[in-house]
Amino acid sequence: AYDVALLEAKGLPPEVWPAPRHDDTLRRYRRLCVAERAFAQSVVSKLAARPRAAAKTRAGVQPRPSASVVFCIDVRSEILRRHLESALPAVETYGFAGFFGLPLEARDADGEATPLCPALLRPAHAVVVEPGPKSSAAVAGKLLSALRKAAAASFTYVETLGLAAVYPMLRAASGHEAHGPGCAHAHEHHDVSLEALRPEVRVSLARGIVKNLGLPRDPGRLLVLTGHDSTTTNNPQAAALACGACGGHGGGLSARVAARLLNDAEVRRALAAHGQGLADDCVAVAAVHDTATDLVRLLDRGLVPPSHQGDLHALEQAFAAAGARARAERAPHLPGLTERDRSDAAALERCLTRRSADWAELRPEWGLAGNAGFLVAPRERSRGANLEGRVFLHSYEAARDPDGAVLELILTAPVVVGSWINLQYYASTVAPDAFGSGTKTLHNIVAGVGVLLGNEGDLAQGLSLQSVHDGEKPRHEPLRLQVFVEAPRARIEGIVARHAVLQQLLDHEWITLYVLEDDGARATRYTPAA
């Protein structure tokens, strides 16, 4: 109205008035803000119902847990954690970035290095993976794979050896190809050498794990470090389903290294000398959560002493029960499942295992579709709350972090990476032509660095259509990341003031931050300074 009055006062005729700008954009922006506020309110209302559990923990009346299980902060872990705590109430769970704070790279016998840390970091240390003697078939397979991916030789490969791929394709299509755990996840069972890590480095890495996790001195008799991976076949975007904190690789190797460090006798003595000692009967165990099937594989079982085998068996049974419940929760959202597939727990497990090994399956799982929140708080704040697999969960105890160093690390690393993941799903959903990578059925891998759609065009970026859409409607609800932090407001403000990356995310509204106060009963939206 003000603009119209001004134009009339200037004597300009209506036909030269500028058209209303961005009306549709503003309407969509308002709807986005309303949807984000509704999601944030739903999370806060669920958290507000659990203040008494947190108060009990701070009062120190909670008994020692039967096991302490560390999961990755990945939203898919939320479902399994919730069901594990239901199946085994005496268990205690933590959320931590799936590389467990270890900036490592894995080197194989040929000297090839694979980074196992987030893109924000550069590997500072190396571990050597020793797969043992290679068969002639394995060597030949590696050579053929390199030939197939070479820029120029790939054409010759197709012309001369393309027909040889017919039989393996027919076997895969008929379901007779070997895709068992021993085949798809053989790296989880290779020997790992920590000889390249000097004693002081091992101690430093272990101290970081204990400090950043906020572990008490008496965690459970089993301290289970659970990485995650996804079983998928013929999928150029398999890295999007693996662990982002491990550089798009599986988290099994990082979990194994972390467990070895925490079980090392010299490291234990050094931890005790620094006031970070763990109970003498606490044994660290490595595990992997397969997010496609919700099966949990326990690694290096032979390193667990006989005195703890009973504890391990009980935990394994709880993992099995939790996995069955998690599969049942996810099943209604997976396209293509029949009533027969969902008829009972065993049938559903077989179905999801078969889907993960099916080279023609476009949606073996939904990955992080639906992600919208990031919670930085003690687990007692959210334990028992159904967050629907939409929230990253990072454990944090403000009382154990008086100088704010741990919180600063969380806000500047995992939260930033979480915003990247969230924006990747957001952009691939709202603007798939510009920021997605089209349909998987047309993907052609180019030199192992990206995909083309068919045989022309530029490298496609972002997620495939099948990663965010079920064929009828979007599976991912595009919301910007809502971050909830239970910590003193002054501490949060100080951290934001020191880091431009956080100021950019908050000032430009790529993320929204809420400060949880009064035992989670109240959430105050953080407003950047003008």
How should each PLM-predicted stretch be described?
Residues Y2-V4, R256, R260, V376, ...:
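Short, hydrophobic/amphipathic alpha-helical patches that form generic packing surfaces
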